[in-house]
Amino acid sequence: MNVDDTAVMIRDMTIRGAGRIARAGASALSDFAGSYEGRDMRAFRKDIEKAKKKILGSRPTAVSLWNGVHATLRGVEEAKDVGDAVSMIQKNAEEFIANSTRAVELIGRIGSKRIEDGDVIMTHCNSSAALSVIKTAYDQGKHIKVYATESRPWRQGILTVNDLGKAGIDTTMIVDSAVRTVMTEVDRVFVGADTITSHGAVINKIWTSQLALAAYEARVQFYVCSETYKFSPMTLSGDTVAIEERSYEEIVKKGEIPDSVKVYNPVFDVTPAKYVDAIITELGVMSTGSVYDVLIRQLGGKIFQTEE
């Protein structure tokens, strides 16, 4: 798929989910490079930079997209010629997509060990990583029940309950505001993440923080399922995560309320680290305090690069 179409599909939520948009961005840049017909390296660098900015501009909050794009373009500045750069981009993209897919599988295996037979689980939005944990536990023969939130305004919970229902899992969809009411029946909560800061705060679909607070109040374990490429290197240097806001038309129809009334429609919220029991990653189960260590010592420049 070309860069323009990919950017539009990410922006209009046709492609959604932090991991999915990261893989889509990597794939689009690979296709762009593969179809490039020019031979001038300076022009190629300029064009690939434009393509990169289009992709990154489609979803400003998700660091997964940023890391996926930069992993795909890693080393291009040192390429000898266009052919070398194209080969490098295609190889990087293939590697990133394979590692991203593999990470979800590993998270499923690791996280499923935290689920016991008979558990009642709650999840929010539509996280591939969280679903991997839940479905892996079910495939292991554990009898579980799942409460999945509707996740307004885009109702990503519809995708989640369809996935779980087709797998044969006992699933109930609840309205977002029923989270606190239902939490007394829940044993564990599993959610995904769009971005995790260096100090362990979790940026995810709006209402995640309320769900975490309800779990904390009820003393229910709250797990974040996240690939490590969703850890934000920019927050190491003090940058904050921009919270994307979307159109009021996702909430109300034009003319439904007076023009003088404002509508605030943030896509994400921030869950403080203290409400997170553990982060389940492809590297293992870790505390929120371990995010800094992973960014600095284990991943380093292999995936993350500093924007100049």
Give the predicted meaning of each segment.
Residues 149-308:
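Conserved phosphate- and dinucleotide-binding cores of soluble alpha/beta proteins
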Residues 1-12, 113, 252-260:
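Short, hydrophobic/aliphatic alpha-helical segments
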Residues 1-87:
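Long amphipathic alpha-helical segments
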Residues 67-117, 142-189:
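Ligand-binding beta-strand-loop-alpha-helix segment within the catalytic cores
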Residues 18-20, 121, 125-130, 153:
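Gly/Ser/Thr-rich loops at beta-strand to alpha-helix junctions
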